[in-house]
Amino acid sequence: MTETAHDRLLIIDFGSQVTQLIARRLRELNVYCEIHPYQNVTMDFVREFAPKAVIFSGGPDSVTREGSPRAPQEIFDYGVPILGICYGQQVMMHQLGGTVQSGHGTAEFGRAYVTPTEERIDMLSGWFLDQTEQVWMSHGDHVSEIAPGFKVYGTSPNAPFAITADLERNFYAVQFHPEVHHTPNGKTLYENFVRLAGFSGDWTMGAYREQMVETIREQVGDKKVICALSGGVDSSVAAALIHEAIGDQLTCVFVDHGLLRKNEAEEVVGMFRDHMNLQVIHADETELFLGELEGQSDPETKRKIIGKLFIDVFQKYADQIEGAEFLAQGTLYPDVIESVSFSGGPSVTIKSHHNVGGLPEKMGLKLVEPLRELFKDEVRALGRELGLPDSFIGRHPFPGPGLAIRCPGEITRDKLDILREADAIYIDQIRKHGLYDEIWQAFVAILPVRTVGVMGDGRTYDYACALRAVTSVDGMTADYYPFSHEFLGETATRIINEVKGINRCTYDITSKPPGTIEWE
């Protein structure tokens, strides 16, 4: 639980796959909220958290099953507004005296349309302007009898109690998911709910910046902090925020493994050292990394070699910094949420950046994680608040192992040099056409095959490359970007004409799933 002076909203997670989207929608409304799994939410916890309102998330279980997830019964007497969503609606009805039934005949999955009843309420302000509202349903059980005190304000063909409310107690319940994209007007419901709950909307990145600067100063005192700087958005914003708080008590270590994009090391070190006046150690260990990777073609082996060497190299340079007691990490809120499974135990894989995984334990350092309350879009907003240039804030994701996983098969210096040049041309083309910000991630992969070509009057036998560009919201699913044929033809021509060593260019149109975004 995080200490904050802002009004707080508690989201009780019953296991929905889209619970994070609820938090995202609320943060967009400048409302501070936290997600906590239902089994951790006791009334002692609620009183300590002191929420101004509560939301019950959806979930995969059935309230008709004995032992299924519940909210603390006393929370209904706590005196704050509550919104129940899908399974959260069923929990509310079940615990307050209504009836929930299982039945395939009334299940709804996918798009549905809700129709209002005659009586309108403030919670539905801005809704039903076109008589019906499109929503996204995902329920097998259904409410067959609402709890005492509730009335119906919206219905759908298979959900006669799609929207219900007890206005006296400020309890609201919907059978659909207002947080998802497929409920186009869903954000309006959240706006109405937080307005009715009395939130001031003071959760801004400016306020967060001031609060976190003070928190870092209190945590660190006069001790020193080390930061593994990658040049990515997360580590860059974390470093800038910590530097604002403690100045030269922060030292950044930029490990150059020889697998970076064209001019990347110089740009990252130059920005932080020369323009932001951070202390940056540029650890150029290209020879070490490429030497260990020589002859290796298995992608998992390459990842493990790079990860282990990174830790060894980082520790070597960190040991030279006297008095360092803290390690800075760019942990984000989704990482914190995903590190605990719905059952309350450790998840199968706790997400950790390969660059810093295992470092705190190995080095005996305490963690400074100034971004652990933020989503990715909030990190970008904080970066702008801190004055970082858009060229860094808006960068596409770049994997820790770098170009190693964009070079299937064995890695050689020659292939890396070819790949850097081709990738630089591709990104230049995307920027020239004004497409960079429309794309989640774009890169070139050099393929482990040579193909025959003709250039001038001569025969060539050079590498083929694949262009990759995807659109995505969170990287979990992705679709290829629909470039025009003109763009692809122009880009392929530039790469083949300007990069010695490539004579064939393809465009990867695989979605995720079944493919992954990266080639390895």
From Swiss-Prot:
Any one Gene Ontology cellular component term annotated for this protein: cytosol
Xref: Gene3D superfamilies: 3.30.300.10, 3.40.50.880, HUPs
The protein's Enzyme Commission number: 6.3.5.2
Domain of life: Bacteria
Record note on quaternary structure: Homodimer.
GO molecular function: ATP binding; GMP synthase activity
Function in brief: Catalyzes the synthesis of GMP from XMP.
Keywords (A to Z) from UniProt: ATP-binding, Glutamine amidotransferase, GMP biosynthesis, Ligase, Nucleotide-binding, Purine biosynthesis
Pathway participation: Purine metabolism; GMP biosynthesis; GMP from XMP (L-Gln route): step 1/1
Residues involved in ATP binding: 230-236
Domain GMPS ATP-PPase: 203-395
Domain Glutamine amidotransferase type-1: 8-202
Catalysed conversion reaction: XMP + L-glutamine + ATP + H2O = GMP + L-glutamate + AMP + diphosphate + 2 H(+)
Annotated Pfam families: GATase, GMP_synt_C, tRNA_Me_trans
Enzyme's top EC category: ligase
Gene that specifies this protein: guaA
Active site: 86, 177, 179
Protein name: GMP synthase [glutamine-hydrolyzing]
